[in-house]
């Protein structure tokens, strides 16, 4: 590759300067990746390096003679050295009394750090030597340090303060960690001898440069340069949130599976979720979406505007345009924010969408956020961190998506979730991924995320007493305006999370109150399901006199405050319970017709008068 002006990234330039002033350097973040860097051996060219090689690329020009690397289970290795530096490195190994590529115990690693840091107290002169402690967190066994581990860190801390400069640098110790807090705060914080440098995830420009380098290895690449550049651009955009090493793995996967360059998005998807098939792009889904308005309208009654709005958003998801306007195609396939009164079909519509999109109502994962109002409930979703009970089990959300990435994920009553969970939702909406308690990455790029809320229906009034903000006497446009206004107030001002509101604002779908016509149809369907159960279980028919049916419908739809759920509960109380008593006392014979003449109250219960 021949870039015009290859330069080191900012984090590596920071390390270059830190070598002159800090005897110890702590590296965190994206420490396990490949890095696209200038090739020291060929001016004007770049190549991909691992972290240790990248460190040597800046240490050697600074006059360092050798680079040693230690990792748990492997031991210490001499990675690179000049002839003079090799002599110095061998002296370090002798002083520490360790051999290369042999596992070391804690005391030996402590001796190794001591031998490196104090090297110039034992020799007349020579080039500086650096030691890289890869996976430094694995040196420690748990959250609570043992006496030996505390002695190890105390020794490293003391050595940093007594280190002597060697020419333009020190005999440097590099600590390599995924997270800064993997080391105790007393060691890593406020220590002016220790430079902390974070290595960021590759941004779009880095991914684009990498995509251009790697795309030549993709099968069936177009011959036209403009088309090849377009493939590289799509590769870079589709790999949002991925590391360069993962991009290299995507190319290998595409080559092995025979996925052509023009379908690089499919290769990225297969790498992320483990399956090359994409239900979102199936012709069957697009056909179902074209006729879905009627189907969803018969399942979720009385919400034609909400259904239409949802289908508009799903059309964008099915055509792959979600996130296209931002250049970020790693966002979830779609996001819906259902708002409205209770019992009007929000949850039912989410279930219906799972069946519509993926052919299975069970492709649906629901979390009641009232159960996640405590701070520790985060562990239930993404898994407990290392050292805590349940760490090996993982989280309900992350496990569910890992097992089946193509599904509807419903977060019910989002306003009841703990504030820390809102950070996780923001990460899902922005990046389409989460890191679970075990450190693995889970991708939501093929999921439909649905939030529901009752915000804006009842709001705090004077003295914080609840006041109805909307009523069933209002028309839908007024209801929608009032509900949207309160949702904005809630996120922007009451909980101070405007960034979350900005992510869902265009996905808000406001549901209407349940109107009498839809309520009667829900009641009639519920009665029909009861009759079907009698026919299925007893072989008998259930019939009603006109007056009994009218009484039942009137009672069921008298109070619509609790929506369809209230209608079903009323029919359960008025019809199902007394019917169960009747069937238990006098079981019907197959073919018998059971006819309800009247329904009468009896104390707190109801009885059926049978003909």
Regions from the PLM with identified roles:
Residues 11, 18, 23-26, 164-170, ...:
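AAA+ P-loop NTPase nucleotide-binding core of proteostasis motors
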Residues 1-263, 393, 401, 426-430, ...:
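ATP/nucleotide-binding catalytic cores
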